[in-house]
Amino acid sequence: MSTKKKPTITKQELYSLVAADTQLNKALIERIFTSQQKIIQNALKHNQEVIIPPGIKFTVVTVKAKPARQGHNPATGEPIQIKAKPEHKAVKIRALKPVHDMLN
């Protein structure tokens, strides 16, 4: 199996690409992205769903508590006790149909 790392667009590269496409300066683009991030964070804190066009959905979900259980160390086979995990909130990020359609 190949372990080659896929190419990634960095934050600065994204700012440059958006600036070139919109003909706005990078400082303004950075302020827009920072503002968007703050708005998303605030919405998620208030359990609101956020959809970013064309179709990326952020949702707050509650992860159920998990009791302590018996497990084993896969390397040695030695039995171990796995700690209980309390109920907590997590962010679920999902690509909607328009994003999936872009790939096909």
Swiss-Prot record:
Changing residue 69 to K: No effect on DNA-binding activity. One of its GO terms (biological process) is DNA replication. Induction: Expressed in the late phase of the viral replicative cycle. SUPFAM superfamilies: IHF-like DNA-binding proteins. InterPro entries: Hist_DNA-bd, Histone-like_DNA-bd_CS, IHF-like_DNA-bd_dom_sf. It is found in: Virion. GO terms for cellular component: virion component. Changing residue 69 to A: Drastic loss of DNA-binding activity. Keywords: DNA replication, DNA-binding, Late protein, Virion. Stilbene derivatives SD1 and SD4 disrupt the binding between pA104R and DNA and inhibit the viral replication in primary alveolar macrophages. GO terms for molecular function: DNA binding; structural constituent of chromatin. The record marks 57, 69, 72, 74, 83, 85, 92, 94, 96-97 as: DNA-binding. Signal peptide: none annotated. Disruption phenotype: Knockout of the viral histone-like protein leads to reduced levels of the mRNA coding for the capsid protein and to a reduced number of viral progeny. Its main location: virion. Belongs to the bacterial histone-like protein family. Homodimer. DNA-binding protein that plays a critical role in nucleoid compaction, genome replication and DNA replication and transcription. Binds to both ssDNA and dsDNA with a binding site covering about 15 nucleotides. Displays DNA-supercoiling activity only when associated with the viral DNA topoisomerase 2. Host antibody response against A104R protein is higher in asymptomatic than in chronically infected hosts. PANTHER family: DNA-BINDING PROTEIN HU, HISTONE-LIKE PROTEIN. This is Viral histone-like protein.
